[in-house]
Amino acid sequence: MMKSSNKSSGSLIRLDKKHIYIQTLGCQMNVHDSEQIAALMEEKGYICTEDANEADLIILNTCSIREKAAQKAKSQLGRYRNLKRKKRNLLIGVGGCLAQQLGDELLTKVPDIDFIFGTHNIHQLPDFISRIEKSRKKIVETTLHPSTPSIGVLALPCNGQVSSFVTIMQGCNNFCSYCIVPYVRGREESRPPEDIIHEIRMLADHGVKEVTLLGQNVNSYARKTSGEMGFAELLREIEKIKGIERMRFTTSHPKDLSEFLITAFSDLSKLCHHIHLPFQSGSDRILALMNRGYTKSDYLAKVERLRTVCPDISITADVIVGFPGESDEDFKETIDMMNQIRFDNLFSFKYSEREGTAAVKMDGKVSEPLKLERLQILQALQEQHTLEKNKAMEGKQEDVLVEGFSKNCRKDLTGRTSTNKIVNFSGCVDLIGDMVSVLIKEAYLHSLRGEMLCEEVVHAN
């Protein structure tokens, strides 16, 4: 959780301060949105808590990209409703994509909610809370304002925090036929480059070593006019910031992956050798129905170019099975593409119908049992590929940015390679924030086990 830039110093906590509990569902953008919410509410005097039972204010930051995520949010609201019945003055707020999508309808379904705010209204939260505290009247605000005030909210990192998210843009103009994002995040809107640079310098001044740039489609950053700075140029400016040692970004759209951006992987020393490049299907027919704007051969050509420019690049992707009209042959083409590319990792999903998208009206719905069967086949294959990729790293020496203690064993440190592989190894707490050299001894499906080479320790500046 991020700290507010105006948080008062000192170790004593005032007993009259209120507590806020934030639960986040969904993507990295939502995670960072929650960090910004925490910063805003800390400035208002709230203290973040990890225990919903002691909260005076609960905010659920929701996702609606798939039905499973939406149902999880609704289920969680039922639990919070029970808390509210025990604690009359508890305020419950709902934000994120499900809030944006349903608005007043969500309030009708769950009347215990006190306020609903959309994806473009985060910066208005302090005002919403003040109004509710005074009047106890419910608020629903999901207007798609210009989003820059919300995505530009600054939050300082916690002590010892090594990596931070930085939102550079919000929204999407692509309207893939299965995707609700353009409807809940709005059209593409980019933050001014000077604001982004200022935020990253601030993070560097507070000890952050790695930034991950966020956007629904970072490749289309500031493309409205030819005179604006593009994404590859932005990366080149961030490269110059003292104290920042690594840059990452997500997510990229294959059709917008330019040669200038591809060559950045060899030109920029701070740009990590990893790209998340959703391919969604290996069938040209399905890609056209999805309105993806590229073909299988287009995608393969970009992968080949990436691997030519940066031979050790790690490539991960998203894929959907069971899209309307997907035949056995279409699915086979997806499997063939996976075997051809051999992704480092893959985020795979069954097609989930989202109201308001073009795919809802398409014929050829695939049954749930068949979707599940295809998903299981695909995931089993990807596990083979992921383990194969990880095993290939055994015996190699990797630079690892130490992020903190391992979740699995508090005696171990954990960090990531440039290729975004998690590495666990023995070491002391003083190494957090340092770039260290680690010999990879053993590979697993989701992580690597290594041994730090003491003579290769390089303390970050």
From Swiss-Prot:
CDD domains reported in the protein's UniProt record: Radical_SAM
Annotated catalysed reactions: N(6)-dimethylallyladenosine(37) in tRNA + (sulfur carrier)-SH + AH2 + 2 S-adenosyl-L-methionine = 2-methylsulfanyl-N(6)-dimethylallyladenosine(37) in tRNA + (sulfur carrier)-H + 5'-deoxyadenosine + L-methionine + A + S-adenosyl-L-homocysteine + 2 H(+)
Chain positions recorded as [4Fe-4S] cluster 1 binding sites: C27, C63, C97
Keyword DNA-binding attributed: no
Family: Belongs to the methylthiotransferase family. MiaB subfamily.
Function: Catalyzes the methylthiolation of N6-(dimethylallyl)adenosine (i(6)A), leading to the formation of 2-methylthio-N6-(dimethylallyl)adenosine (ms(2)i(6)A) at position 37 in tRNAs that read codons beginning with uridine.
Protein name per UniProt: tRNA-2-methylthio-N(6)-dimethylallyladenosine synthase
Native source organism of the sequence: Syntrophus aciditrophicus (strain SB)
